[in-house]
Structure formats: structure tokens, C-alpha cells
Design a protein with these regions (language model features):
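Conserved alpha-helical scaffold segments that buttress catalytic/binding sites
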Residues: 2-310
Length: 310
């Protein structure tokens, strides 16, 4: 397993003038909380340099840190591509959820992909549902839209890849908690071929049925592999308050482990991004320990090969 530390906050907005979102601290905070030990001796740790954050969008776009996100994504893509091409599971620790773009850009070089997107928000903001010519925005609310080819070309077009990083019908989004709100930001996602299980549907059908829907998606086409995106705000805020936009209801740790285990142990799984944990909102480190405990008990395909997980 390659554990790729991606210390970025480029996709997030400042909370007040002069503020820098703290997600860039997450990889080191998780390492300090014992993640390397929890994953075991077979994990190799690789670290990307931290990019410089700027609260003001660059000339030519209203996407905050837009061009810096592309540059960081291209670097991350090289790391992920090397892992995937060597047959090694890539665990990418962010950082905000803009890390999904670079991870997919690297994994996609191996062939067509499916995406299992766990997130308390669908992150489907794109020029079709907001005024991109007037409103400043951050990629952290756009990652699924960009991954499916919606948005500015410098964040939807990638070297050696034709078309979007993943087509709509190769995506399942799990955990949205705002889809029943009157002011839901991206209702147009319901008119796409993206499979959705919002948190309310999940509460009705449970882990087994949700897992069956995921497996049905993975069996419905001939993608070379699949990628998992785990935005930790999909967990209930009582469990994971240390995120940009915490909320309830959400998944439990037990739910998440049960959903992830059959995926990370699958030979088709190329890797997983973990995003949006903010150590600045976790002064006693409790949330870091929760994440280390969750990630440390997963039956990654390489760990089962080494015999470290029963």
C-alpha cells in the first residue's frame, strides 16, 4: 500500500479575512495519531509538498486557487499513476476534496473507471446550476461535477485522458443529507445517470442493500477498476464534527466500515481518497483517533494478502 499525503486546502473558502482552512494539516495529524502503525509495516508513506493558498481567485477564473489546484492535481496524478501501474493500492490522505481530481487523473490512465463517492454533500456545483461568471466559488463544492466533466476546461480536461474522468453512469454518490431541503443547491443531479443513495434512503434500506446497489453498478459495465472517495463529513456530526460542513443525519463508523470493507478488499479497487478532516476543529485529537480507528480496521486488498487482517 502507498499512503500518499496530500496536504492541501486549496478548494476551501476562508472563514474570515486572513483565515486559511486547516485541512492541509490533516495528513500529518493522522500520522501523529498513529495511522501508519494502524495500517501496518507494508505501508509506504509518500508526501506531496504543500501548495500555497490564496483567498483571491487568479485572473481569468472565479474559482479560488483554480490554477494551483490544477498544478497540485497533476503532481498528485503522477504519484497515483505510479502506484496504480505497479499494482499497489493508493490511499490518498487530504486535504480538502479537490484531491479527488488528481487521484482520478492518475488512476484513469489505467483505463476507464467507476467512482464510489461517499459524501454528506454531492459536490455537484457547476456552471449549469450557478452563475460562474459572477460568483466566486471553491472546488470543494464542485469535485463530483468536475470529475464528470462539468466546469471549466482547466479542471475537466487532463493529459492522456479523453472525455471526463468518470462518466455519469459509472458513479454512485452515497450520503447526501440536503437533497430534501427546499434550497438544495444542485437538484439537477437527479436528472443525470449518477446513481444516488441519500442518507434518508440509506436509513431505510441499510448497509446490505446499499452494498448490493454498489456492486450492481460495478458489475454493470467493463471499467478497468474503481476508485473510492471518502469525504469524512458523510459521518454524522456527533462522530465527526471536525469538518468544513458537519451535519446530521450521517453514517456511523460501523456503517462506513461495513460499506468500505468489501470495496477496499476487491482486486478492482485502485485506491481511495480521504478528505475534509480539519485538525483545527479537533483540538483534543479525538476525531483524528476516530478516523485512524476506522481506516486501520479496513481489510485492504494488500493487507489481506499479507495476512494482517483476519
Amino acid at each position: 500500500m502507498d499512503v500518499i499525503l496530500a496536504p492541501t486546502n486549496l478548494g476551501l473558502s476562508p472563514l474570515y479575512p486572513g483565515h486559511e482552512p486547516g485541512t492541509w494539516r490533516a495528513p500529518n495529524a493522522l500520522m501523529y495519531a498513529g495511522l501508519a502503525e494502524a495500517l501496518g509495516a507494508e505501508a509506504s508513506i509518500l508526501t506531496l509538498p504543500r501548495p500555497q493558498y490564496c483567498p483571491v481567485p487568479p485572473a481569468g477564473t472565479l474559482i479560488r486557487n483554480g490554477y494551483a489546484i490544477r498544478a497540485f492535481s497533476l503532481t498528485l496524478a503522477e504519484y497515483v499513476a505510479r502506484s496504480v501501474q505497479s499494482g499497489t493500492f493508493a490511499l490518498v490522505l487530504g486535504g480538502d476534496c479537490s484531491i479527488l481530481l488528481g487521484a482520478l487523473a492518475g488512476a484513469r490512465r489505467n483505463g476507464p473507471l467507476s467512482l464510489i463517492h461517499f459524501d454528506g454533500h454531492s459536490d455537484f456545483r457547476h456552471p449549469g446550476n450557478y452563475d460562474a461568471s459572477r460568483i466566486m466559488s471553491g472546488v470543494a463544492g464542485m469535485d463530483l461535477a468536475l470529475a464528470t466533466g462539468r466546469g471549466e476546461p482547466f479542471l475537466t480536461q487532463w493529459p492522456e485522458i479523453e472525455g471526463p474522468l468518470v462518466p455519469d453512469n459509472h458513479v454512485i454518490q452515497i450520503g447526501e443529507r440536503e437533497s430534501h431541503d427546499a434550497d438544495f443547491a444542485w437538484p439537477d443531479i437527479a436528472r443525470t445517470a449518477i446513481t444516488q443513495i441519500d442518507i434518508f434512503d440509506f436509513q431505510k434500506i441499510g448497509v446490505a442493500a446499499a452494498s448490493a446497489k454498489i456492486q450492481a453498478l460495478l458489475s454493470s459495465h467493463s471499467a478497468a477498476g474503481f476508485w473510492i472517495h471518502f469525504d469524512v463529513d458523510v459521518l454524522d456530526q456527533l462522530i465527526m464534527p471536525a469538518v468544513d460542513c458537519p451535519g446530521s443525519p450521517g453514517l456511523s463508523v460501523a456503517d462506513m466500515v461495513s460499506l468500505l470493507n468489501p470495496l477496499v478488499s476487491d482486486r478492482r479497487c485502485l485506491g481511495m481518497t480521504v478528505s475534509i478532516y480539519d485538525p483545527e476543529k479537533d483540538p483534543d485529537g479525538h476525531c483524528a483517533k476516530t478516523l485512524v480507528g476506522l481506516l486501520g480496521q479496513l481489510a485492504y486488498r494488500e493487507r489481506t494478502s499479507f495476512g494482517t487482517v483476519p
